[in-house]
């Protein structure tokens, strides 16, 4: 079992939903990079449950303890170990159904792989709880990317059948303005159209009151990536971003730019025409989401991820008792989200940051962290 993502810049995660703690080790950061613990806390707060009928009643403080690799607000150049304690667990909720395989969960696949030795409490290592470690590690990289002029943000494109305005894929200036709007918003859903927030909340609460759940779509934009980042084929920009995107539990689909819409276009419609803008090469449209041949072309990278409904629902379901080897009904206990889409937005942002950070480090070494305003001018 390997719990590490990344080559040049890597994050290893550990822990289980009801264990003593979860956390990670971030390796590959240069020395002297500022680490804003207030920013990390703000990112964690966006992921944190509120117990408000829109998310799980399990509310954790999610304080991030930096155990190594950071002194006086700057990286030391050694591995950054971080830990988040689990304090609000109720493992007894799972005792009565321990032998029943929950539909949509990893109970059966974990049993098939680990032969009963896995920690099944609250989903164990497969729980969405572990995404707190992704956010904590990703937030450190996200801050470094921001100083290098690279912006990453995510909004709720669709939730419970209700849609937000899409990102302006073909207008980089309009997209930058949309990103600024999202980053200026405080608490609340990550939306471009604030008028759809209450209808979304109403739909989520309605599903929860019925013992059910809903899913949605997240849309992520990456601005400021220079041309020439990424590798053809196996380590393409799409490959590594997708790798991390699918590391977020409940993500079941991804598309870049026009994505599956390409199937209905002609080549003359799908190609992004090149043109000069001052000394820079840009494209007139951005169907390919700033990526050609697996390598960035300098235009914004935009992708969408499909998030399935939370599998933990309170309606009675059909399953099997894998110890008794017989069919059985299942009524799930415990505390669960009627929808994880709003909380998953920051998770997807931080997951993308880890992928982009690894890509940037593979291309520029640690120069982009050490000289965030100068590495592009150095012609590396």
Regions found by a protein language model. Give the residues of each.
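Generic N-terminal targeting/processing segments that precede catalytic cores or assembly contacts
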Residues: 1-380
């Amino acid at each position: 079992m390997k719990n590490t993502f990344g080559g040049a810049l890597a994050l290893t995660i550990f822990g289980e939903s009801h264990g003593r703690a979860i956390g990670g080790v971030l390796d590959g950061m240069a020395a002297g990079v500022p680490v804003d613990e207030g920013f990390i806390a703000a990112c964690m707060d966006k992921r944190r449950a509120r117990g408000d009928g829109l998310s799980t009643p399990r509310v954790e403080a999610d304080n991030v303890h930096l155990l190594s690799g950071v002194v006086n607000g700057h990286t030391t150049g050694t591995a950054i170990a971080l830990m988040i304690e689990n304090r609000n667990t109720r493992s007894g909720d799972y005792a009565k159904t321990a032998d029943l395989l929950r539909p949509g969960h990893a109970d059966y696949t974990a049993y098939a792989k680990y032969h009963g030795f896995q920690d099944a409490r609250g989903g164990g290592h497969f729980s969405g709880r572990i995404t707190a470690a992704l956010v904590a590690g990703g937030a450190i990289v996200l801050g470094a990317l921001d100083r290098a002029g690279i912006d990453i943000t995510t909004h709720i494109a669709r939730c419970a059948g209700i849609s937000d305005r899409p990102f302006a894929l073909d207008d980089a200036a309009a997209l930058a303005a949309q990103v600024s709007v999202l980053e200026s918003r405080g608490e609340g859903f990550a939306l471009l159209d604030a008028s759809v927030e209450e209808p979304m909340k109403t739909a989520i609460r309605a599903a929860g009151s019925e013992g059910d759940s809903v899913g949605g779509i997240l849309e992520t934009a990456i601005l400021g990536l220079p041309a020439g980042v990424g590798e053809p084929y196996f380590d393409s920009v799409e490959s590594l971003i997708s790798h991390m995107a699918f590391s977020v539990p409940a993500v079941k689909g991804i598309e870049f730019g026009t994505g599956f819409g390409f199937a209905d276009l002609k080549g003359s419609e799908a190609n992004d025409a090149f043109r000069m803008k001052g000394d820079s090469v840009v494209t007139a449209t951005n169907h390919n989401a700033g990526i050609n041949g697996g390598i960035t072309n300098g235009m914004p990278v935009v992708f969408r991820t499909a998030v399935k409904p939370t599998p933990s629902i309170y309606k009675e379901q059909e399953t099997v008792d894998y110890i008794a080897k017989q069919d059985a009904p299942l009524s799930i206990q415990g505390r669960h989200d009627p929808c994880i889409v709003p909380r998953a937005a920051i998770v997807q942002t931080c997951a993308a940051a880890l992928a982009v950070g690894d890509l940037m480090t593979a291309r520029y070494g640690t120069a982009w962290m050490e000289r965030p305003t100068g590495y592009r001018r150095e012609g590396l």
